[in-house]
């Protein structure tokens, strides 16, 4: 999991992500390049939101790489050029779309740290979805959730899998979540 997302670099061997249009060697990219080039996103076992930033800002942070390119690495943004403003508006629209999907539009301006735990989990997942990944890696997304929140998580993951056609690689102990979304299950002892 950590090698796949670039958190650790393998010492030997190769890792490829096969997509219909090309074969991407993950070993040659840094973690942020894996997200940008190979379209692999992840969440961590422990929530890694920016608690003092707003819910909306947390989703915009995920789109930082695209906005930096659109801004000419800050020049166009500083000059407030139309091309940058348009890209920025697209990023805001994408963030609002995902907030609507998880029912948090009304909390867009609240600090992410003020959300209930289950909502923070969903926010972290849709933050990863803001880069439009081909593969979403989730490390125990249901950890600490009650049964109602786990059911909401399953609904979100099914939407991501079916409607967004995003592959999901899941590490999880909650078997209702695993069996609710999985096509293939591998168990490690």
Question: Model-flagged regions — what are they?
Answer:
Residues 40, 156-170, 174, 180, ...:
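Conserved catalytic loops of ABC-family nucleotide-binding domains
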Residues 5:
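Helix-to-loop junction immediately C-terminal to a conserved catalytic motif
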Residues 136-140:
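Catalytic Walker B motif of ABC-type/P-loop ATPase nucleotide-binding domains
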Residues 132:
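Conserved catalytic motifs of ABC-family nucleotide-binding domains
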Residues 125:
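Hydrophobic anchor residue at the start of the ABC signature
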Residues 71-107, 155-159:
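Conserved ABC ATPase "signature" region
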Residues 9, 22-47, 82-89:
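ABC ATPase NBD coupling module
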């Amino acid at each position: 999991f950590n090698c796949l997302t670039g958190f650790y670099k393998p010492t030997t061997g190769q890792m490829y992500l096969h997509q219909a249009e090309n074969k991407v060697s993950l070993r040659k990219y840094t973690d942020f390049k894996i997200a940008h080039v190979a379209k692999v996103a992840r969440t961590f076992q422990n929530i890694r939101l920016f608690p003092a930033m707003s819910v909306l800002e947390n989703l915009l942070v995920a789109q930082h790489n695209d906005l930096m390119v659109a801004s000419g690495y800050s020049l166009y943004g500083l000059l407030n050029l139309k091309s940058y403003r348009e890209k920025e508006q697209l990023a805001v629209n994408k963030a609002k779309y995902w907030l609507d999907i998880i029912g948090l539009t009304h909390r867009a301006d609240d600090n992410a740290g003020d959300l209930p735990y289950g909502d923070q989990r969903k926010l972290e997942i849709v933050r990863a979805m803001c880069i439009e990944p081909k593969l979403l890696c989730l490390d125990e997304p249901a950890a600490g959730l009650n049964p109602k929140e786990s059911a909401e998580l399953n609904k979100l993951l099914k939407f991501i899998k079916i409607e967004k056609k995003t592959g999901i690689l899941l590490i999880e102990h909650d078997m209702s979540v695993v069996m609710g979304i999985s096509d293939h299950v591998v168990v490690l002892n």
